[in-house]
Structures are given as structure tokens and as C-alpha cells.
Amino acid sequence: MDSEAEPPQEKKKPNSCPSFLSLPEEILVNCLARIPKSYYPKLSLVCKSFCSLILSMELYVERLYLGTHEDVLHVCLQLPDRRLPSWFSLWTKPDQTLTNDIGKKKKSTRNTLLVPIPSSYSPRVPMFIGEIGSELYAISKHNTPSSVMWVRDKTSIYAWRKAPSMTVARANVFAYVINGKIYVMGGCAADESKYWAEVFDPKTQTWKPLTDPGAELRVSSIIGMAVSEGKIYVKNSYVKDYVYDPEEDKWDVVASSFMIERKCEIENVLYRFSRQSCSWYDTKHKEWRDIKGLATLNRRRRSSILEVAKYGDKVLILWEIFAKPFYQNKSIWCAVIALEKRKIDEIWGKVKWASIVLTVPRSYVFLRCEVKPV
């Protein structure tokens, strides 16, 4: 062997780039908050750290702070094989052209789906967030009973603190702000007759029970609630529906037809959706007028509207039909409609997309839906 031969040179290792995960958590959260939510399911598969951050409350708060949050539809259903209600959120597949599937043989592209909560698609059940003056109040709608209410000043994203607790622990609660007070109903044991419904006054920082609506409402499942002209209308799983008047602290039975027509307000225009028509209220002539351009939607959608919601500057509607061929299941349809005022007395609608978003057993119960920033 030649002693003069040069020893073999060690191969130089390429400079490894610093790991993204080596960055401080605050920076990671800030980066993730700038990415559209539709990409989160794939990102959560990268590693456990990403999955943990995507499910974290810190990311939710950061998206609100940066203004990158998106309006997301949340739906609550009672499924026959589940003891507790199940929450779902609407997920849109990224970089896809959404289509109108009404009248088509292929009923779903699966580009829009209702996915279970919690999951990488949507980490948590939506919260009630009510605004009173300069403060925001939050109450969880999770299936785990809790009496906690949170409050923070609107100018400080991170400074949530505990507000006075509700008198009883509630799960999947209904809550509304009316005339500067927070009204909560249900979510507790049916025998909690005194505190089945209560109201919080921010001025006195106290909770006060409302009049007992009676056992029939307390033991039933609430499947709809609406506020109109300062009154709370409650639709339950029985034949009767109820209305509560905060001014008189009084419950009354109301005609069920009030809850059949679903309404929402967009840019100071009230819209109404029923089994066979879509209309808007002309305040000048004090009459309801048909929304033009939606004849195909009205003709194909011959079933009851489940819910209507404001979806940004558009309107979102949900309805159900029996699924062929054996009709053992139901298909939940979702459509997003853009609205345009063309003349003084004309409003036109255009279906931006419509598709089946979930198939469920026919015996399921639709409880409610909400559009929340996430």
C-alpha cells in the first residue's frame, strides 16, 4: 500500500435547513393562522405537533386577531345511534370548482361535506359569543355540562376571564342577547324547573331565573329557536311551539307555522324561505316578493327547509330529501345563493353551488345550525 497515498476525504454533510418546528410556538401559530382552514386536515398529518397546534385554542384566537378567520357552517344533529347530539362543520375541498348539483344524476362531487367535530377539519364545537357594549361574552355548547361563562374586552383578544357562572351547568345550550341581556335555555336536567331558563344582566353581574315554561317544553328536545321583535320563539320535538316575552317574563303557546318559514336578514333586507318559494320583504310596499332566478331550485326542492343562515354576503339554505333507492336514509342538501338587487322592486338569486353534504338515517333529528367565524 502506498504510504504516500492521501487518506480518503470525508464527505461533507450538506448544511441541513433548520426545522420549521424549531421555531417558537407563537411564530408557528402565527404562520398556521395565515393558511386557509381547508388545508388543515392534510397539515395535521405531517406530525403530532402540527396536529396539536391545529386543534389548539391559540390558533383559533390568532385567526380572530389577524382577521384570517372564515365563516364556517356548524350543524347539530341527534343521530339514532348516539346518546348525545353530534356536531358537524362544513368543509370545502381546497382548489376545487364548486358546482350546482341540483337536477344532476351524479348528486355529489364530495367537494363539500359536513364533517364531524372534533376532527382535524374542525377542532371544536362552536361557542355562543354575544356582544354587549364593549365586551364579548362566550359560553361553550359542548356536550359536557358546564356553568362557566367567559368575558373579555373587545380590544383585547387574549384577555378572556371568567364571568359570573350560570346557576346550573348546561350542555349544548341555546343563548341569545336581547336588549343588553344574555338569555340561556335548556341543556340542563328536565327537573331543573326553576333554572331551565335564566338571564344574565351585565349591569348587576347577576343571573336571574325565568318563569318555568312547563314540563312539556323542559323534557322535549329543542329543534329550533329564533328571535323576532324582542321575543324568543322555541320549536321543540312535540306538536306545540312556544314564545317567551322578556318584557312580561311570560311563556305562551304559538302557532307552529311561525317556525316553518325560515328567515334571515342580509344588508337590511329580510329574506324568507319556505317549502316552495324564496322571497324578500319589500318595506316600501309592505309585501313579500319572489326572488327571481330561483325557479329550478324551488321546483327541485319540494321538501321542508331545515335552516337558513347568513353566509357572508350570501344566504345558505339546508334541506333534506329521502335517499333512493330504499328510502332508509335521508340526504342533507346545502346550497349557497348570491343575491343581487337589479331594480327598485327586483332581487335576483343565483345558486353558487349546491350538493349533498351528508347522508343520515331517516330517524335522525335536525337540531340547529350556526355560522361562526373560525
Swiss-Prot record:
The keyword DNA damage does not apply. Keywords: Kelch repeat, Repeat. InterPro entries: F-box-like_dom_sf (IPR036047), F-box/kelch-repeat_ARATH (IPR050354), F-box_dom (IPR001810), Kelch-typ_b-propeller (IPR015915). Kelch repeats lie at residues 135-180, 181-227, 231-278, 280-308. It comes from the Eukaryota. Gene3D superfamilies: Kelch-type beta propeller. Residues 17-63 form the F-box domain. Pfam families: F-box, Kelch_FKB95. This is Putative F-box/kelch-repeat protein At4g39756. It comes from Arabidopsis thaliana (Mouse-ear cress). The lineage of its organism: Eukaryota, Viridiplantae, Streptophyta, Embryophyta, Tracheophyta.
